[in-house]
Amino acid sequence: LMKKFRVKHGSNEPAAYAVCALKKLKIEPKENEKIYYGVFDFGGGTTDFDFGIWKNSEDEDMFDYELEHFGAGGDIHLGGENILKELAYKVFSDNTPELRKRKIQYVRPEWCPELSGEEILVEYTREAKLNTRKLGEEKLRDIWEEKETERIDNVLVNLFNADGSLETGIDLKINEEELKALIKDKIEKGIKNFFIKMEDAFKDEDVKKVHIFLAGNSCRHSFVNEIFEKYVAEMKDKMELVIYDLKAIKEIDKENDSKITGKTGVAYGLIYSRKGGRIKVTNRDEKENMANEVNFKFYVGNNRRNKFNCVISPNSNYNEYKFFGIVKSDIFELYYSTSPEAQTNEMKSSEAKIKRVNLKKDYDDEEERYRIYLKADKSDKLTYAIVKEEKDIETKKLVEEGEISLN
């Protein structure tokens, strides 16, 4: 039996969900019509975006439909469980005097900036991780899942101190309005990035209408529909947005025992788009980068007046040098981010990560203007090259060359 067992690369999850939703909702393309779609997959760990075109297959003997998807992106930090971690961090940060007195430590999420005075409180020990999990799971999940019926001003929680002993009945103040504002801000930023990425994905298309499918259990939050409806109103003169939330998808098969959900929708989509099926799924990004399975993962740039100035993006071609700037010493700094907002050149540079690259020699010579170029080599790797004149990058007359890893 195992000799017949095969594992094959199929559609990604958002594309598979789109296949299922388009088929189940009976969104039928007319002859030569392109139907544009987007998927906002807001899960527990991350949020994924996917965009594409649904159309009738040109080869009717082989397929009924073709789905071409492209412009995939997302937010690796926007997810229900990550929001819980950030809520816990916010509550801990608002109660530092009590925590310091009891020697209680907690975890700061990697995407949150360091706050002054928390040096001895933030740790990554087993106890610190347990404290963050306990506060989030036991006391803050109801706020995130909108289950609380009465206002919460404080919680009593048992936490571990730095010595590993359990401290009982710790009274932590909670500002529920601030926690809800944090949730809304996180979701709003994620949806803003979705639309930035959508405009970029469809920039070469004449788009009048887009079907948007909300997937992932975190899309149940009321702020998600509220913010998407705001975009529907704001963009009505530009294009029509049709939003399908989880409830709309579930209603498709309400009489069927095997109802469509965020998870089963992906499974059905993978079945519909399997090899030998009647739906052909193609990934434009993979076709354009035949030697590389995925696009470059980051937005890379420099700091211009405290704004992120984008030089390389996930749309950039591999092995194509881009001018980065003038090098002035034996070190240069680059900024990088996974947020689609980075491509607008309006994002604060402080919201990106910074990478300092040590060079092989010092270029502190005001009479010579050495130019530095960057190119993407792999999904998370760059090469830099330093030249004296612009023409030298074409002739490969390099003064210095090196690799940069963004892992």
What are these regions (language model features)?
Residues G10-Y17, F42-G45, G79-L87, L172-F194, ...:
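Phosphate/oxyanion-binding active-site loops and adjacent basic polyanion-contact surfaces
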Residues L25-E68, L214, L270:
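Gly/Thr-rich phosphate-binding beta-strand-loop-beta motif of the actin/hexokinase/Hsp70
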Residues S165-A181, D185, S273-N407:
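Acidic low-complexity intrinsically disordered segments
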Residues G52-I170, I279-P340:
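Phosphate-binding glycine-rich/basic clefts of nucleotide- and phosphate-handling proteins
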Residues K103-W111, D206-N217:
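Short glycine-rich phosphate-binding loop at a beta-alpha junction
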Residues Y17-K30, D163-K209, V224-I227, S273:
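Phosphate/ATP-binding catalytic cores across multiple sugar-kinase/actin-like superfamilies
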Residues L1-G38:
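Nucleotide/phosphate-binding catalytic cleft detector across ATP-hydrolyzing
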